[in-house]
Amino acid sequence: MPRSLKKGPFVDDHLLKKVDVQNDKNTKQVIKTWSRRSTIIPDFIGHTFAVHDGRKHVPVFVTEAMVGHKLGEFAPTRTFKGHIKDDRKSKRR
């Protein structure tokens, strides 16, 4: 179930402050964050966030198409190595 419209999108306060400071200074430095739950708002467009995936920080450049999504959607937490296509050693037994 989506969030109520009267509440508005959730954004961590510390993240919003960092973006506002960079917008005031007209700088575009990478913002390191652990807040995967924050919703991307139009103020974030053009900024790069380093979103933590549990192991390292993944750089995410925010575009217009990302508005309304969560930061964590763009930093996958699981690595898929792929299925083994053909294992000849186990078939010989």
Curated annotation (Swiss-Prot):
Coiled coil: none annotated. Keywords: Ribonucleoprotein, Ribosomal protein, RNA-binding, rRNA-binding. Gene3D superfamilies: 30s Ribosomal Protein S19, Chain A. PROSITE patterns: RIBOSOMAL_S19 (PS00323). It comes from the Bacteria. One of its GO terms (molecular function) is structural constituent of ribosome. One of its GO terms (cellular component) is cytoplasm. The keyword Cytoplasm does not apply. GO terms for biological process: ribosomal small subunit assembly; translation. Protein S19 forms a complex with S13 that binds strongly to the 16S ribosomal RNA. Belongs to the universal ribosomal protein uS19 family. NCBIfam families: rpsS_bact. This is Small ribosomal subunit protein uS19. It comes from Mycobacterium sp. (strain KMS). The lineage of its organism: Bacteria, Bacillati, Actinomycetota, Actinomycetes, Mycobacteriales.
